[in-house]
């Protein structure tokens, strides 16, 4: 028979050596209570006293998670996906309205031409329309081809009815992040809503693709959106208490059964 290959030899158990302490030194554990020893360094981020504006922003965000949010308001949490939003903003930037400097230059050239006795053909430029009242009028007159709404308008009541109006008039609409980005397109700090009435011939193919995708994401999903409530998410402590209570009730019910 072939010799058996044995494993490693058992390691002898180490003897525990008792630590010799000097009886002259007393053991004084630190008390980290009020007026006691300084606590060890740790992350104190949550105890920072933030500025009032930041505090209100945080409280509003938490409150939106805790309270039940009706579907009309909850729809503003569903925004356009990043890739489609990038293509949309590229399109909107092509139709930016002129700023003050460009307008001044155009009027100066026109005045010079008129002074020389030339006839100037003034073509109406194709630009992005903005302003809530103006956009509403364009939707009601069925002139709007696409409506872009900001998700963070404050107060939200200004635009909460706009998606319903767009659906009624069968105008494609989308909700994007955020009002500052929309404002930068029209040379303003913020803009709650933008609108395109028409595009140039070379952009029509790309624009039709964007419209199709937006319709599929927003106009066609109306039945889902109008039923979906938001919020109602409690904090971690509250969830832990609820779980413990449910566990206790389940245990009592099991005991009654036996």
Swiss-Prot record:
Gene3D superfamilies: 3.30.1330.30. One of its GO terms (biological process) is ribosome biogenesis. One of its GO terms (molecular function) is RNA binding. Residues 1-20 are annotated as: Disordered. GO terms for cellular component: ribonucleoprotein complex; ribosome. Belongs to the eukaryotic ribosomal protein eL8 family. This is Large ribosomal subunit protein eL8z. The gene is RPL7A-1.
């Amino acid at each position: 028979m072939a010799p058996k290959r044995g494993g490693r030899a058992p390691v002898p158990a180490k003897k525990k050596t008792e630590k010799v302490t000097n009886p002259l030194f007393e053991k004084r554990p630190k008390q980290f209570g009020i007026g006691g020893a300084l606590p060890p360094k740790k992350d104190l981020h949550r105890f920072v006293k933030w500025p009032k504006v930041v505090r209100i922003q945080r409280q509003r965000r938490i409150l939106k998670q805790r309270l039940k949010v009706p579907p009309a308001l909850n729809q503003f949490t569903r925004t356009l996906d990043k890739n489609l939003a990038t293509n949309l903003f590229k399109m909107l930037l092509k139709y930016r309205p002129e700023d003050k400097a460009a307008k001044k230059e155009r009027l100066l050239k026109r005045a010079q031409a008129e002074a020389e006795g030339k006839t100037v053909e003034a073509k109406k430029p194709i630009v992005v329309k903005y302003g809530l009242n103006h956009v509403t009028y364009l939707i009601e007159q069925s002139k709007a081809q696409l409506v872009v709404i900001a998700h963070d308008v404050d107060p939200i009541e200004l635009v909460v009815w706009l998606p319903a109006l767009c659906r009624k008039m069968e105008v494609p609409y989308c909700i994007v992040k955020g009002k500052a980005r929309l404002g930068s397109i029209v040379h303003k700090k913020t803009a709650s809503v933008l609108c395109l009435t028409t595009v140039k011939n070379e952009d029509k193919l790309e624009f039709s693709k964007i419209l199709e995708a937006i319709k599929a994401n927003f106009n066609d999903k109306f039945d889902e959106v109008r039923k979906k409530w938001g919020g109602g998410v409690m904090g971690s402590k509250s969830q832990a208490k609820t779980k413990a209570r449910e566990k206790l009730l389940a245990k009592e019910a099991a005991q009654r059964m036996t």
